[in-house]
């Protein structure tokens, strides 16, 4: 049930007002079915590390939230294998390999800072076709 807690935190703390840290994501990306796309998540405090426990949450147009990745690279139960999390350089990354039209959604990154989560503004992924 950790995913429920994370999603509730997203709703409650999305402004990030309790932290000096700022989490930045691409505002929008476009891809096509079958392509590989990588979304990134940068921290204003320096390199993202495994200690930030990067989490990725998907929001579908009907406002259904799904936790995809926890702890940088751990796929949540039931999440398709085409979704993977990693660190690339100084950023956290979500890679979708073989994108499907159903992957069109908003994707939010959350980073852990000692005692609270800070969320990025989200990336709107458009899948053409």
From Swiss-Prot:
Coiled coil: none annotated. The keyword Metal-binding does not apply. It comes from the Eukaryota. This is Ig lambda-1 chain V region S43. Keywords: Adaptive immunity, Immunity, Immunoglobulin, Pyrrolidone carboxylic acid, Signal. CDD domains: IgV_L_lambda. Residues 1-19 form the signal peptide. One of its GO terms (cellular component) is immunoglobulin complex. It comes from Mus musculus. Pfam families: V-set. GO terms for biological process: adaptive immune response; immune response. Residues 20-125 form the Ig-like domain. SUPFAM superfamilies: Immunoglobulin (SSF48726). InterPro entries: Ig-like_dom (IPR007110), Ig-like_dom_sf (IPR036179), Ig-like_fold (IPR013783), Ig_sub (IPR003599), Ig_V-set (IPR013106), IgV_Light_Chain (IPR050150). The lineage of its organism: Eukaryota, Metazoa, Chordata, Craniata, Vertebrata. The modification Pyrrolidone carboxylic acid is found at residue 20.
């Amino acid at each position: 049930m950790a995913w429920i807690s994370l999603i509730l935190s997203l709703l409650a703390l999305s402004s990030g007002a309790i932290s000096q840290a700022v989490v930045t994501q691409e505002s929008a990306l476009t891809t096509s079915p079958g392509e590989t796309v990588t979304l990134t998540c940068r921290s204003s405090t320096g390199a993202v590390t495994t200690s930030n426990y990067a989490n990725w949450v998907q929001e579908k147009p009907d406002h259904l939230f799904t936790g995809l990745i926890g702890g940088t690279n751990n796929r949540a139960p039931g999440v398709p294998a085409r979704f993977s999390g990693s660190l690339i350089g100084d950023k956290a990354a979500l890679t979708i390999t073989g994108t499907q039209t159903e992957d069109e959604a908003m994707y939010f990154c959350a980073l852990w800072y000692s005692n609270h989560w800070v969320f990025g503004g989200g990336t709107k992924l458009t899948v053409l076709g």
